[in-house]
């Protein structure tokens, strides 16, 4: 990874006055935004939206996001929806606070390729609603096969990319947006009992990411709306 992405928090850009993240502890998309806010050192208020109880369908929440999904981020007097749009806003608004994209255009494109592979292929095909429909129509066994197939195709492609680009993390030894989207997907793979043996690079990078303090504090179990054990 080029040095330009390895900067520290040297920015003089003032922090926004109030930042509110609408999140659900188990949402992988909201987890991406929690991570970016933590890496960039932007304090935020956590507003829980209980997806299991259907709070995303209330009139109040639909006004914030007509697609009725988390995450939503209120920042700088605007309301932003969609995790990738939010990540790009944070990166462009606070480019010097722990940069998550390098300046090199080819590397940026490769990082966007990984972000897209995970956020536009792997994650949408295993959303809770889709898995519930498959289970209801075809049963638990077919649902598991569906999950395994998505991961097999998605992670095989990702492994081939990361073999060439990874250092300690997805692109060299610097955290980028690719790592931000990988963290929740890696956790989902483990939760859904995906065999990671065919993907040694993903496994190594995922485990290295899990050691970071920002990752530890952003995990679902550490969110205010996680069930108390
Ligand atoms: N492309 C959107 C997808 C957001 C998304 O899929 N959110 C899920 C949780 S990870 C959700 O809110 N689902 C609510 C539902 O399925 O009713 C993003 O990246 O933010």
Walk through the language-model features, giving the residues of each.
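Generic structural signal for helix capping and beta-alpha/helix-loop junctions
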Residues: 31, 54, 206, 226-227
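Short, solvent-exposed turn/loop segments enriched in Gly/Ser/Thr/Pro and often Arg
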Residues: 24, 50, 177, 222-223
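GST-like domain detector, emphasizing the conserved glutathione-binding G-site
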Residues: 2-145, 149
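A generic structural-conservation signal
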Residues: 46, 70, 198, 218-219
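GST-like fold's C-terminal all-alpha helical module
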Residues: 106, 114, 118-211, 217
